[in-house]
Amino acid sequence: MNICLLDESGAGDGALSVLAARWQLEHDDSAPMALVLTPQHLELRKRDEPKLGGIFVDFVSGAMAHRRKFGGGRGEAVAKAVGIKSGYLPDVVDATAGLGRDAFVLAALGCRVRMLERNPVVAALLDDGLRRGYADVEIGPWLRENLTLLHASSLSALTDITPQPDVVYLDPMYPHKQKSALVKKEMRVFQSLVGADEDADGLLQPARTLAKKRVVVKRPDYAPPLAGLTTPNAVNTKSHRFDIYAPLTR
């Protein structure tokens, strides 16, 4: 994949070259997107809109730490949707990991979550966030146990992941109507990089074949059901719904 690669870390240790080789990224000085290594983290920038700033994964501080400490915990909609109960913490495959927010919430509640991400740039951002999270004194011990990353296409990986998860979680990219600053910023940067998940409908059947207990699909409240398949089971919030599907027998 071609992207502008910039090293602003000041370290001069060749880390960016190693990263590019690992994720098979080719430097393109004319690319509209830049992957930038700063002294703090790896971040993604939209070069023609510098005011948007950089997108990066941070499990240790900021919004994710606040959600972990002060969010709804097991009362969060995503926790209810995957079926967390007293004494039951499902094993989850998040097949559309993105920036890992929902996966992190589930991991913080005690679920073991395997994240799938097919875009190499997004996978590199996730890997960088995990590396810093694993090294953190407070969250590192349980994060290493509960949250891992697999760089692979969900369409192919869902057919051969072992062991089978209890739950497959899907949150395909869908155009957002909301104009909140964060959504607007992230969606503009992300859609410039990966576009819409046009093959997302094809994920539902392999997800239902893989999952032992259920498949959960997060959708904006105005979006049609994935693959046009309605389900009577859902957890609803003000702006989203989590459609719940039974597994298919193999």
Curated annotation (Swiss-Prot):
Q: Which GO terms describe its cellular component?
A: cytoplasm
One GO term in the molecular function aspect is: rRNA (guanine-N2-)-methyltransferase activity
Pfam families assigned to the protein according to its UniProt record, in alphabetical order: SAM_MT (PF04445)
Keywords linked to the UniProt accession: Cytoplasm, Methyltransferase, rRNA processing, S-adenosyl-L-methionine, Transferase
Q: Where in the cell is it found?
A: Cytoplasm
What domain of life?
A: Bacteria
> Known EC number(s)?
2.1.1.242
What is the protein named? Ribosomal RNA small subunit methyltransferase J
